[in-house]
């Protein structure tokens, strides 16, 4: 009868320390990969927008840089 409370306490202590399941780790990896992809797309869009602004400023100042347009 004394073993039952000790067993229950040990179960409660051991359950939070259980390793994550494979499914949870895969979900975390997919979420992290999605965020990384979103950051790359945002950065690429930001850089292309910055280049467009620089190109338009260059065309206003000197027409030789926008001969391709």
Swiss-Prot record:
Keywords: Disulfide bond, Neurotoxin, Secreted, Signal, Toxin. Residues 20-54 form a propeptide. GO terms for molecular function: toxin activity. The keyword Secreted applies. Its main location: secreted. Contains 2 disulfide bonds that can be either 'C1-C3, C2-C4' or 'C1-C4, C2-C3', since these disulfide connectivities have been observed for conotoxins with cysteine framework V (for examples, see AC P0DQQ7 and AC P81755). It is found in: Secreted. Residues 1-19 form the signal peptide. Expressed by the venom duct. It comes from the Eukaryota. GO terms for cellular component: extracellular region. The cysteine framework is V (CC-CC). Belongs to the conotoxin T superfamily. This is Conotoxin Lt5.10. The lineage of its organism: Eukaryota, Metazoa, Spiralia, Lophotrochozoa, Mollusca.
């Amino acid at each position: 009868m004394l073993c039952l409370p000790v067993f229950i306490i040990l179960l409660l202590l051991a359950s939070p320390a259980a390793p994550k399941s494979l499914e949870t780790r895969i979900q975390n990896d997919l979420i992290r990969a999605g965020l990384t992809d979103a950051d790359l797309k945002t950065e690429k869009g930001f850089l292309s927008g910055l280049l467009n602004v620089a190109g338009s400023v260059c065309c206003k100042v000197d027409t030789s840089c926008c001969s391709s347009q």
